[in-house]
From Swiss-Prot:
Organismal lineage: Eukaryota, Viridiplantae, Streptophyta, Embryophyta, Tracheophyta
Binding site for Ca(2+): 10, 12, 14, 19, 208
One MF term in the entry's GO annotations: D-mannose binding
Self-association and partners: Equilibrium between homodimer and homotetramer. Oligomerization is pH-dependent with homotetramers forming at pH 6.5 and above.
Positions annotated to bind a carbohydrate: 12, 99-100, 228
Organism per entry: Dioclea guianensis
UniProt-recorded name of the protein: Lectin alpha chain
Binding site for Mn(2+): 8, 10, 19, 24, 34
SUPFAM superfamilies the record matches: Concanavalin A-like lectins/glucanases
Keyword field: Calcium, Lectin, Manganese, Mannose-binding, Metal-binding, Toxin
Disulfide links within the chain: none
Additional remarks: Binds one manganese (or another transition metal) ion and one calcium ion. The metal ions are essential for the saccharide-binding and cell-agglutinating activities. Is being tested as a molluscicide with potential application in controlling schistosomiasis. The causative agent of schistosomiasis depends on freshwater snails of the genus Biomphalaria as hosts during its larval stages.
Post-translational modification remark: The beta and gamma chains are produced by partial proteolytic processing of the lectin alpha chain by an asparaginyl endopeptidase. Mixture of 60% alpha lectin and 40% of its beta and gamma proteolytic fragments.
PROSITE patterns: LECTIN_LEGUME_ALPHA, LECTIN_LEGUME_BETA
Length: 237
């Protein structure tokens, strides 16, 4: 199975797998059952921003999700990613819809990793930034239903030609280049990721959510990982 660390923007509470009974931001370490969550006042039809950061000195993974003009949601979890993830990983975004649906539109995405060893400063760092997405992106690995549209957006899950979200959809987008996320001799390792998103839904209960995730380089969408499993995990254990 893949080794996954993720920050989930979970729009639909699945209390049967340990979700709180409201939309939430969660930190997932090798399981869909979040280690830490915070209530998320999700706003459909508004552009939101998610910022995720990790620092190997503090050994803390944190996320802040906000909408312009309203308060932000913050969640963090203390974890040493050296003990969780392989040394080389890929970073990605995933989303799903189920019986209920929503658009999972990504407008921009940037990522910077910092890996400083005593001998070489920043030689192993990686930076990318998408302010829009090209029609046939060579620098993204698109999995299942994920596509880029003519407006320069990344649609992680299926939308109709008129832009309406479709149910039972799963999609992921990964940056093509592997990231050197840690090294034994590193003085400091860390990363910052930011993406802007737009969730729209005709349903009273939008579903299911968007994640930023880090995984082994050969990661693929597990069978049966749709809906509440957010395209990341084969089961709810």
């Amino acid at each position: 199975a893949d080794t996954i660390v993720a920050v989930e923007l979970d729009s639909y509470p699945n209390t049967d797998i340990g979700d709180p009974s409201y939309p939430h931001i969660g930190i997932d370490i090798k399981s869909i059952r979040s280690k830490s969550t915070a209530r998320w006042n999700m706003q459909t039809g508004k552009v939101g921003t998610a910022h995720i950061s990790y620092n190997s000195v503090a050994k803390r993974l944190s996320a802040v999700v906000s909408y312009t003009g309203s308060s932000s949601t913050t969640v963090s979890y203390d974890v040493d990613l050296n003990n969780v993830l392989p040394e080389w990983v890929r970073v990605g975004l995933s989303a799903t819809t189920g019986l209920y649906k929503e658009t999972n539109t990504i407008l921009s995405w940037s990522f910077t990793s910092k890996l400083k060893t005593n001998s070489i400063a920043d030689a192993n760092s990686l930076h990318f930034s998408f302010n829009q997405f090209s029609q046939n992106p060579k620098d993204l690995i698109l999995q299942s239903d994920a596509t880029t549209d003519s407006d320069g957006n990344l649609e992680l899950t299926k939308v109709s030609s008129s832009g309406d979200p479709q149910g039972s959809s799963v999609g992921r987008a990964l940056f093509y280049a592997p990231v050197h996320i840690w090294e034994k001799s590193a003085v400091v390792a860390g990363f910052d990721a930011t993406f802007t998103f737009l969730i729209k839904s005709p349903d009273r209960d939008p579903a299911d959510g968007i994640t930023f995730f880090i995984a082994n380089t050969d990661t693929s969408i597990p069978s049966g990982s749709g809906g509440r499993l957010l395209g990341l995990f084969p089961d709810a254990n």
